[in-house]
């Protein structure tokens, strides 16, 4: 097998991608491709936990029912059943790998989270994602069959034209574009929160896997369903940090810039209304009262809570806010809603197989059907582990004989990176603002149509960039050696902007198509949930259609 030939190429180094590497058969040669340094994915940021029905008083059936209730009629019952019944084994495997979950004595500690009927959420202090990713990374680095390519950017999938099979991926790495030929490609690139002006996702969450798959003809679905958290610490230059709903549960007030407690203007329960209601209240209040609502905040005032109780209940929030210059005992926390989790993704079955043979997807990149229209808390890390476990049984066809003599010729190209920088940076600044205002927490047909028209204009301009004309249609049988000022930074900016423009178009199209409100999708002009829309929104190429839901509720 040649240097650029692999059995499986895994794209993404969060919990999903790392665990996939560990679950793939040990005799497979695996390439792990990650566009940044390791441990910059969203699962490393996950403060929440991982859910499993392991308590004597709990059951997979109860976990199943809670998941379906949260999913607002769009969960796939078979996928949810698979998830909850494999959850205890997933926890056992993580413990065996060395993840140190919190314990009460000899027993794993379980906490109760929103919309769960039983305490079933395991934590590793308040940084569960980091604990899992750190442990898995150590295991992957020790695997002799896994070759890690850091700061490598996936550009396009290699689809065999006669069979339609995915046979590899084109990658920019070490200032060279080359094709990694493989028997399968697994996309585990996380979500796309950077398409919105406010997000809890890290900078690398630009929807890469979903964009790559869609451009290659894979089916994607339910992309209108995005979960927004109502209260994230929001300061210029500071990464968004979630302020738990428990803070409002203890009595904290939401105030606007004038000091008005405004939440009761939108719902009789005020700050204690459901998460999506509070998010909409803040979003609408900022739209009504601020000149630039995409950059504005409201304030979470903890003064009604006794200081001793704050210290006992929220030590991590105290520490993190203080680190970013906010003393919560002396001042309110500036907060705003933020895009948090993308329920939709590349359509897959329970074996991670997409609609393209040889192409697999996992984690937030995939749409397995377990989340429906609204994810149940702490099911996302679980989904990564449970579905990755299926890859132990992965059987692949031989590498195509045409791939045995590849990348022999090298072509050198100098890229003038300065020409296109202004437009690329303009889109990276303006696209998240446009999406936040038109496809964020509150949507309506008129503004969605306006945004789609703007996106179509930007897409046409993107295709006319000198860099796009040069890079978008490179031959797969050549290595391309690139040079130019600031090349690595430019290539990441170019590729991510391409992906963000595409996923923005997909979100807008799906949101306009669904003429109702359900789960993580709210239409001001269609505020009711309608039985006839209890179906998945599917996009395949330019075709948009409904697919009946397999929900068992």
From Swiss-Prot:
Keyword Flavoprotein: yes
Textual note on the cofactor: Binds 1 FAD per subunit.
Active site: 275
EC code: 1.4.3.16
SUPFAM superfamilies assigned to the protein according to its UniProt record, in alphabetical order: FAD/NAD(P)-binding domain, Succinate dehydrogenase/fumarate reductase flavoprotein C-terminal domain, Succinate dehydrogenase/fumarate reductase flavoprotein, catalytic domain
The family this protein is said to belong to: Belongs to the FAD-dependent oxidoreductase 2 family. NadB subfamily.
An example Gene Ontology molecular-function term: L-aspartate oxidase activity
Any Pfam family hit: Succ_DH_flav_C
Protein name per its UniProtKB record: L-aspartate oxidase
Top enzyme category: oxidoreductase
Gene Ontology annotations of biological process type: 'de novo' NAD biosynthetic process from L-aspartate
The protein's required cofactors: FAD
Recorded superkingdom: Bacteria
GO cellular component entries: cytoplasm
Keywords: Cytoplasm, FAD, Flavoprotein, Nucleotide-binding, Oxidoreductase, Pyridine nucleotide biosynthesis
Locations listed in the record: Cytoplasm
Gene3D superfamilies xrefs: FAD/NAD(P)-binding domain (3.50.50.60), Fumarate reductase/succinate dehydrogenase flavoprotein-like, C-terminal domain (1.20.58.100), Succinate dehydrogenase/fumarate reductase flavoprotein, catalytic domain (3.90.700.10)
Binding, FAD: 13-16, 35, 42-49, 208, 364, 380-381
Reaction(s) catalysed (UniProt annotation): L-aspartate + O2 = iminosuccinate + H2O2
Pathway: Cofactor biosynthesis; NAD(+) biosynthesis; iminoaspartate from L-aspartate (oxidase route): step 1/1
Segments passing through the bilayer: none
Annotated positions for site Important in orienting the L-aspartate substrate: 113
Record's function text: Catalyzes the oxidation of L-aspartate to iminoaspartate, the first step in the de novo biosynthesis of NAD(+).
């Amino acid at each position: 097998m040649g240097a650029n030939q692999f059995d499986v190429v895994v794209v993404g180094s969060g919990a999903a991608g790392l665990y996939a590497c560990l679950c793939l058969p040990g005799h497979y040669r695996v390439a792990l491709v990650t566009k940044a340094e390791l441990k910059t994915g969203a699962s490393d940021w996950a403060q929440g936990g991982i859910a499993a029905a392991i308590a004597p008083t709990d059951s997979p059936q109860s976990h199943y029912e809670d998941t379906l209730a949260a999913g607002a009629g769009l969960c796939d019952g078979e996928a949810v059943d698979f998830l909850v019944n494999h959850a205890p084994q997933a926890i056992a495997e993580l413990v065996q790998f060395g993840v140190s979950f919190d314990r009460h004595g000899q027993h794993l500690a379980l906490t109760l989270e929103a919309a769960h009927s039983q305490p079933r959420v395991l934590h590793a202090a308040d940084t569960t994602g980091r604990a899992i990713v750190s442990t898995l990374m150590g295991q992957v680095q020790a695997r002799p069959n896994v070759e890690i390519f850091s700061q490598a950017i996936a550009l396009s999938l290699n689809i065999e034209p006669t069979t339609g099979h995915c046979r590899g991926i084109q990658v920019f790495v070490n200032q060279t574009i080359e094709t990694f030929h493989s028997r399968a490609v697994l996309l585990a690139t996380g979500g796309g929160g950077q398409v919105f002006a406010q997000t809890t996702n890290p900078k690398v969450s630009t929807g890469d896997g979903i964009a790559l798959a869609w451009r290659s003809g894979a089916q994607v679905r339910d992309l209108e369903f995005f979960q927004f958290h109502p209260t994230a610490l929001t300061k210029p230059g500071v990464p968004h940090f979630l302020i738990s709903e428990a803070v409002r549960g203890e009595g904290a007030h939401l105030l606007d810039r004038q000091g008005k407690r405004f939440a009761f203007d939108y719902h009789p329960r005020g700050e204690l209304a459901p998460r999506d209601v509070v998010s909409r209240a803040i979003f609408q209040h900022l739209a009504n009262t601020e000149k630039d609502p995409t950059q504005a905040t409201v304030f979470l005032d903890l003064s009604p809570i006794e200081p001793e109780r704050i210290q006992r209940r929220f030590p991590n929030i105290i520490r993190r806010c203080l680190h970013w210059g906010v003393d919560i005992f002396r001042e309110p926390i500036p907060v705003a809603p933020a895009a948090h989790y993308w329920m939709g993704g590349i359509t897959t079955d329970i074996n991670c197989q997409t609609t393209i043979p040889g192409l697999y997807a996992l984690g937030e990149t995939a749409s397995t059907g377990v989340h429906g229209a609204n994810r149940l808390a702490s099911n996302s890390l679980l989904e990564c582990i449970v579905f990755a476990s299926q890859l132990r049984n992965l059987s692949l066809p031989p590498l195509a004989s045409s791939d045995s003599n590849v990348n022999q010729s090298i072509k050198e190209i100098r890229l003038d990176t300065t020409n296109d920088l202004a437009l690329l940076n303009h889109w990276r600044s303006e696209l998240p603002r446009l999406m936040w205002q038109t496809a964020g927490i509150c949507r309506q047909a008129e503004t969605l149509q306006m945004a789609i028209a703007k996106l179509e204009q930007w897409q046409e301009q993107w295709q006319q960039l000198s860099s796009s004309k040069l890079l978008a249609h490179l031959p797969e049988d050549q290595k391309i050696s690139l040079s130019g000022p600031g090349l690595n930074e430019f290539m990441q900016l170019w590729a991510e902007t391409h992906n963000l423009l595409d996923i923005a178009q997909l979100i807008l199209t799906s949101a306009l198509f669904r003429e109702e409100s359900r789960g993580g999708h709210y239409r001001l002009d269609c505020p009711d949930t309608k039985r006839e829309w209890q179906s998945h929104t599917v996009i395949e190429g330019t075709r948009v259609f409904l697919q009946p839901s397999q929900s068992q509720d």
